[in-house]
Amino acid sequence: MGYLKRIGMCISLLIVIIFVTSCGGGNKITGDSKETQIKKSFAKTLDMYPIKNLEDLYDKEGYRDGEFKKGDKGMWTIYTDFAKSNKPGELDDEGMVLNLDRNTRTAKGYYFVKKFYEKDKLPDRKNYKVEMKNNKSILLDKVEDPNLKKRIENFKFFGQYANFKDLENYNNGDVSINWNVPSYDVEYKMSNKDENVKQLRSRYNIPTDKAPMLKMHIDGDLKGSSVGYKRLEIDFSKEDRDISVIDYLSYKPAKK
């Protein structure tokens, strides 16, 4: 009886060990850390920067999944906006979004001017249709304001001059994860000596010497997905004044 009892105890102990090991293993991050995985996911597009000639995207293929129909070459969407609080309770936002269809080798989109209000007032928004030919933005709508017209025609996306070849050198970021979406975020403190920061300061009116934060956000699978999206933000905000640049480059099906 004592022998059988010892065998039973050993079996019970073995079951407990297996249970603890299997449960504990599920909470461990195997391989790369989430911070490294987020950076590697972003690197798939950021390694393409700077894209000086956007028409080069017609010959580049992104991540494909089951959402793509047979024969669909896909569509690149590039976006940049600059948001700034010029008055308390208001946020002015300008930028451009351009869809580059690899099937038709055409690029169409719009330049937008938005104003948001904190109080009970709907935002103002105006879109101006544009297309791209020979790597130049062509305004299709009539614009009375000569300064606005010039900004539209001379507009450059962040991805056309940004350079993230040293992305792997960004370390010790503040990582947050929402497993329900899932979504992933990591933030890094940038230096004013960073070439990307210098580029933004030379192109936009940024009335602060504060070094910005680099914020990287992913919705969806870290390995890639045509359903989710990635957004990069360089945030110069201080106190009650919002100042930021948002950028993204995505690859999705062109045919619904």
Curated annotation (Swiss-Prot):
Topology versus the membrane: Lipid-anchor
Principal subcellular localization: membrane
Pfam family membership, one: DUF576
Lipid attachment site numbers (N-palmitoyl cysteine): 23
Keyword terms of this UniProt record: Cell membrane, Lipoprotein, Membrane, Palmitate, Signal
Subcellular location: Cell membrane
Highest taxon in the source lineage: Bacteria
InterPro entries (alphabetical): Csa, Csa_sf
Record lipid sites (S-diacylglycerol cysteine): 23
Span of the signal peptide: 1-22
GO cellular component terms, A-Z: plasma membrane
Family assignment from sequence similarity: Belongs to the staphylococcal tandem lipoprotein family.
Name this polypeptide is given: Uncharacterized lipoprotein SAS0400
Species of provenance: Staphylococcus aureus (strain MSSA476)
